[in-house]
From Swiss-Prot:
InterPro entries: ATP_syn_F0_a_bact/chloroplast, ATP_synth_F0_asu, ATP_synth_F0_asu_AS, F0_ATP_A_sf. This is ATP synthase subunit a. Disulfide bonds: none annotated. F-type ATPases have 2 components, CF(1) - the catalytic core - and CF(0) - the membrane proton channel. CF(1) has five subunits: alpha(3), beta(3), gamma(1), delta(1), epsilon(1). CF(0) has three main subunits: a(1), b(2) and c(9-12). The alpha and beta chains form an alternating ring which encloses part of the gamma chain. CF(1) is attached to CF(0) by a central stalk formed by the gamma and epsilon chains, while a peripheral stalk is formed by the delta and b chains. Key component of the proton channel; it plays a direct role in the translocation of protons across the membrane. HAMAP family: ATP_synth_a_bact. It comes from Campylobacter concisus (strain 13826).
Length: 227
């Protein structure tokens, strides 16, 4: 039923094309926003530059609170801020009738979760060394190490599942809710729903970015605590 509302169906009806088309559209929007914000930069921010700078400062503040270091927060800013842009615009675009949320596809959310998973483990190994990082999985008690290590490995792998399915499930549910509202009352009744779904899109973006910083904090915490 949702396909009836999609403009992309004018080009191709396949689900793979629909999600690829809307992800490319999201990427284009992000590039345009970045270009406009950078092309007219002023000492006193105005317009879009002001919004983007406020967003970046908010991400840095979030990272500082999570990591306990502004230096580390700025170090991981490009990753977290980029993921935030992708998740936000992927969520919001689906609220507009005729468009689909790329984040309502498990493919995208799984890729984003894998990027976070691979990167924070890479940072953990780079900061602490291979043996020290994975040795931390065994816990402080050597006798419990054979039990703790597989438990920790499973716990870390489950983060990929929780990150991807949380975002996918929430946005897919939002899409179905919006579809029901548009079907039952296509004009004025969905307006409160649009506001609620926008709030949910922002909330899911915040959660994804926060968890990214939390996982990074856990990965680099071994060496940071020693310093």
């Amino acid at each position: 039923m949702k396909d009836l509302f999609l403009f992309s169906n004018l080009l191709n009806h396949s689900h793979a094309f629909v999600y690829a088309f809307h992800f490319c559209l999201v990427a284009l929007i992000i590039l345009i926003v970045a270009y406009i914000a950078r092309s007219k930069m002023q000492l006193v921010p105005r317009g879009l530059q002001n919004i983007v700078e406020a967003y970046l400062e908010g991400v840095i503040s979030m990272g500082k609170d999570t990591l306990g270091s502004e230096k580390l927060a700025r170090k991981y800013l490009p990753l977290v801020a980029t993921i935030g842009f992708i998740v936000f615009f992927s969520n919001v675009i689906g609220i507009i009738p005729g468009f689909e949320s790329p984040s309502s596809s498990l493919n995208l959310t799984l890729v984003l979760a894998l990027v976070v998973f691979i990167y924070y483990n890479f940072e953990g190994i780079r900061e602490n060394g291979f043996f020290k990082y994975f040795g931390h999985f065994m816990g402080p008690n050597k006798f419990l190490a054979p039990i703790m290590f597989p438990v920790e490995v499973i716990s870390h792998l489950s983060r990929v599942v929780s990150l991807s399915f949380r975002l996918f499930g929430n946005i897919k549910g939002d899409d179905l809710f919006l579809l029901a509202m548009l079907t039952l009352a296509p004009w004025f009744a969905p307006l409160p729903a649009f506001a609620l779904l926008t709030l949910m899109a922002v909330l899911q973006t915040f959660i994804f970015m926060m968890l990214t910083y939390v996982y990074l904090a856990g990965a680099v915490a071994i060496s940071e605590h020693e310093h």
